[in-house]
UniProtKB/Swiss-Prot annotation:
Catalytic activity, reaction form: tRNA(Ala) + L-alanine + ATP = L-alanyl-tRNA(Ala) + AMP + diphosphate
Protein family (similarity comment): Belongs to the class-II aminoacyl-tRNA synthetase family.
Subcellular location: Cytoplasm
Purpose of the protein: Catalyzes the attachment of alanine to tRNA(Ala) in a two-step reaction: alanine is first activated by ATP to form Ala-AMP and then transferred to the acceptor end of tRNA(Ala). Also edits incorrectly charged Ser-tRNA(Ala) and Gly-tRNA(Ala) via its editing domain.
Lineage: Bacteria, Bacillati, Chloroflexota, Chloroflexia, Herpetosiphonales
Organism for this UniProt entry: Herpetosiphon aurantiacus (strain ATCC 23779 / DSM 785 / 114-95)
Name of protein: Alanine--tRNA ligase
Source superkingdom: Bacteria
Length: 889
């Protein structure tokens, strides 16, 4: 049974038992900073179990994407040599939130394993909790299991194996593990094999019975609504059901391994000699595909660094078996072919995944050769030592991008180990330096700025783009100086400035400072301490000193682009609420000079009609040239006016309210033709004086950023004009290619599509006629074999679907008999067998016929008694296999 079928059968079985089928959550846990990655199916239900969240269902089932590659649950080093360890795996799980408990959980598990997928009960063992001074032995589970298996197969273990807890405080409970014997001879089973080093006894399913709660004082109480959390590895279940010993021999991995062999042009001997490297590539290809699909990119911190390690580790092992150029996009394409139906995000992001992983491989390949040379140069310095320098290991990582585990592997081949303490010391020193360099990142609050107790900066930029001020602080490379010189990248604070500091989504200004002896080009302005505007820039001329009076001028063109976009976000917000409802509140924004980005609450994507309506409304308000005003007032007064406060922002007693329109008709110049706008928001940003200054508003994209949160990106002013010009040029180019005037491009495309459809319909009609003729021709070849009408033939088929349809048509038209067909598609042999109902009753079995024939072409398969298909690897053996088909009856 294929892995994909096992997954679907699991979901379908529990759906029939009243469980809501819940899609897998992301590998990146939502709102859980304690977890680097999702490691179990229950992670997405954690708040439900803890009573913090309610769902519209009380029982659920899922197939959860999981990654175990860090901390205690780190399988990375075992991946490759181990037959069953993986970084990525799928956890099948069923869950009860105060609904059913042990009786049904055990019944469901037994029914699924023995009845739904046909596992042998005589190979099954279960474990229960033996109890301790606080939690008694789980006699309830023991007695429930007795209904399904003899007492000698119900084993008792301690807390290490059979007690689950969420931590020192919180829910906990006994668990019951289901183990399966995969050895050759079931008569050799002994109880001592369970939870031992004997890997012919394999745990496949863990049923957790959450029935207690432990408080801060260590006191245990029964939960008012006990719950169920179960987990079963699809990879392990495939081992059991497919009758193999290693997960890499299941169909969850063999297609990836075959892709590697095809790319290298190698055979089974090469694979057997280098199986660990093949397994690393196969395992990591799955992890990499899902990590990128879930939004990660390779980097040097946190989750991004884990992804970089995996890509580079896979690339390195690939090179050890013969790859010279990037190859992971090809193995990942196989992963997507296999898993894209179950996880559509893989297919939708396939091109992006390939681009990201290939780029990272190329970067690694550029540094690998130099890194290896550097490592070789370092090794003589380690003479007569058993430990490789941690400082050198860090240099390989920092300069050449060598992950630590890669260095460990290479030096281990020379009999050395890495000084991990020294490596960590170097890494922490770099992080400390990085924290100092990161002072201008958004939201960064540097302790040294707070300690200086600087007076709040007076912002003059609401009314002017140039003003004078005095230098209060100067900083270079983290140190406070009295004077900064040409060429230095500096930070400085003035007592007053026209430059806006980044906040509320609006980017900081750029500009120039001119003093009596020097000039600083300003790149950015931030507020690391409330009220203190820290400017960042480079001294381009002379020097600047503390106390000097200077003149600061804002980049006017950039500021105009920013204010257009900022006022446009207010208009967009108003239009969204008017179109979608008041729930469409702002969740975040970016106001940059070249574009605006606006995140808002909405459960589903917007239709083309809705987007056009919103865009038209905003442009109507722009054409109305309504007045934009700002006023400071008490917070209660602002609320009385209906001013919107945004996404949990904290406000003082006095707030700034930006109002667009909302006044008399005279506030809107074009009141005869346009509906006036009325928008009031609490906002500290800078804006246009009238909406007409925005010029033009154009939505360029709409999509999802999180559950229930949508994002619109748009352009205004100069950027909008450029966008429209680019689109017009695109239409002209398409017109040239289609031989049509720009205004006729749509008409020409419609005509081409209609013609294409007509041709496809004609092709399908002709295929139908050919198939009908082929059916009649094949029926004419019918023979009698052992009293059974039989058609055996090799046929031509364009694809697997047409091959299957031909077999079904023959079976339906033969009346009574058996059909056996073979074909070759893309160089691979395919076989099918079909039997009419009366022949099935007479004992004919299409699945058995196909299984026997598939073995002759180097494949396997089977299926139902009335219809079955199988594939193989040896197309040259197909004719001989068909020639021997008669003898199978």
């Amino acid at each position: 049974m294929k892995g994909s079928e096992l997954r679907q059968r699991f979901l379908d079985y529990f759906a029939r038992q009243g469980h809501a089928v819940v899609p897998s959550s992301s590998l990146i846990p939502a709102d859980n900073p304690t977890l680097l990655f999702t490691v179990a199916g229950m992670v997405q239900f954690n708040d439900v179990f803890l009573g913090r969240e309610s769902r519209p269902y009380s029982r659920a089932v899922s197939s959860q994407k999981c990654l175990r590659i860090s901390g205690k649950q780190n399988d990375l080093e075992n991946v490759g040599p181990s037959p069953r360890h993986h970084t990525f795996f799928e956890m099948l799980g069923n869950f009860s939130f105060g609904d059913y408990f042990k009786k049904d959980a055990i019944r469901f598990a037994w029914e699924f394993l023995t009845q739904e997928i046909g596992l042998d009960p005589k190979r099954m063992w279960v474990s229960i909790y033996e109890g301790d001074e606080q939690i008694p032995a789980d006699e309830e589970a023991h007695d429930l299991w007795l209904a399904y298996m003899p007492a000698e197969r119900i084993l008792r273990f301690d807390a290490k194996d059979n007690l689950w807890s969420a931590g020192d405080v919180g829910p906990r409970g006994p668990c019951s593990e289901i183990h399966y014997y995969i050895g050759d001879d079931p008569d050799n089973q002994v109880p001592e094999g369970v939870n031992s080093e004997d890997d012919t006894y394999m745990e496949i399913w863990n049923l957790v019975f959450m029935q207690y709660n432990r408080d801060e004082n260590g006191v245990l109480t029964l939960l008012p609504k006990p719950s169920i959390d179960t987990g079963m590895s699809l990879e392990r279940l495939a081992i059991v059901k497919q009758g193999v010993f290693r997960s890499y021999e299941t169909d969850l991995f063999t297609p990836i391994i075959h892709t590697v062999m095809e790319l290298l042009g190698t055979g089974s001997d090469h694979y057997q000699a280098n199986s660990s490297a093949y397994h690393v590539v196969a395992d990591h290809s799955r992890s990499i595909a899902f990590m990128i699909a879930d939004g990660l990119r390779p980097g040097n911190e946190g989750r991004s660094y884990v992804l970089r390690r995996l890509v580079r580790r896979a690339a390195y092992f690939g090179q050890t078996i013969g790859f010279k150029a990037p190859f992971l996009a090809e193995t990942i394409a196989t992963v997507i072919d296999m898993m894209g139906a179950a996880y559509p995000e893989l297919r939708s992001k396939q091109a992006y995944i390939a681009e990201v992983v290939t780029g990272e491989e190329e970067r690694f390949n550029k540094t690998l050769a130099g890194g290896l040379r550097q490592l070789e140069a370092m090794l003589p310095n380690q003479a007569d030592k058993a430990v490789f320098s941690g400082a050198d290991a860090f240099k390989l990582y920092d300069t050449y991008g060598f992950p630590l585990d890669l260095t460990e592997r290479i030096v281990a081949e020379r009999g050395l180990t890495v000084d991990l303490a020294g490596y960590e010391a170097e890494l922490e020193a770099q992080r400390a330096r990085g924290r100092g360099a990161a002072q201008f990142k958004k939201g960064a609050v540097t302790e040294r700025w707070a300690e200086r107790n600087l007076a709040p900066t007076s912002f003059t930029g609401y009314n002017e783009l140039e003003s004078w001020g005095h230098v209060l602080a100067l900083e270079f490379d983290g140190e406070e100086l009295g004077t900064v010189q040409r060429g230095q990248e500096v930070a400085f604070v003035l007592d007053r400035t026209p430059c806006y500091a980044e906040s509320g989504g609006q980017m900081g200004d750029s500009g120039v400072l001119v003093g009596p002896h020097g000039t600083i080009v300003i790149d950015d302005v931030q507020k690391p301490v409330p009220g203190v505007f820290v400017h960042r820039g480079k001294v381009s001329k002379g020097s600047v000193s503390l106390g000097e009076q200077v003149t600061v001028t804002v980049d006017a063109a950039r500021r105009r682009d920013i204010v257009r976009n900022h006022t446009a976000t207010h208009l967009l917000h108003r239009a969204l609420r008017d179109t979608l409802g008041d729930h469409a509140e702002q969740k975040g924004s970016l106001v940059a000079p070249e574009r605006l980005r606006f995140d808002f609450n909405n459960q589903k994507g917007l239709s083309s009609e809705q987007l056009q309506q919103i865009e038209d409304q905003v442009n109507a308000w722009i054409r109305a040239d309504s007045k934009v005003e700002a006023a400071e007032m008490a917070l209660p007064q602002a609320r009385e006016l209906g001013a919107m406060a945004l996404f949990g922002e904290k406000y003082g007693d006095v707030v700034r309210v930006v109002t667009v329109g909302c006044g008399n008709a005279s506030d809107h110049i074009h009141t005869n033709s346009e509906a006036p706008v009325c928008s009031r928001e609490l906002c500290g940003g800078v804006h246009v004086a009238r909406t007409g200054e925005i010029g033009f508003f154009k939505i360029v994209s709409e999509g999802s950023v999180a559950s229930g949160v949508r994002r619109i990106e748009a352009v205004t002013g100069r950027a909008a004009a450029e966008w429209v010009s680019q689109q017009a040029q695109l239409i002209r180019t398409l017109g040239d290619k289609l031989g049509a005037q720009p205004g006729k491009v749509e008409e020409k495309l419609d005509a081409l599509l209609l013609d294409q459809k007509a041709r496809r319909d004609e092709i399908e009609r002709l295929r139908g006629e050919i198939a009908a003729g082929q059916v009649d021709s094949l029926l004419a070849q019918k023979i009698e074999q052992a009293g059974t009408p039989l058609v055996v033939a090799r046929v031509e088929a364009s694809d697997a679907d047409s091959f299957r349809r031909l077999g079904e048509q023959l079976r339906d038209k033969i009346g009574s008999g058996v059909v056996i067909l073979g074909t070759v598609i893309d160089g691979k042999p395919l076989l099918l067998a079909a039997a009419t109902a009366d022949q099935v009753k007479a004992g004919r079995h299409a699945g058995n016929l196909v299984k026997a024939l598939a073995a002759k072409v180097g494949g396997g398969g089977g299926g139902r008694a009335d219809f079955a298909q199988a594939g193989g690897r040896d197309a040259a053996a197909l004719d001989q296999a068909l020639a021997e088909a008669n003898g199978l009856l």
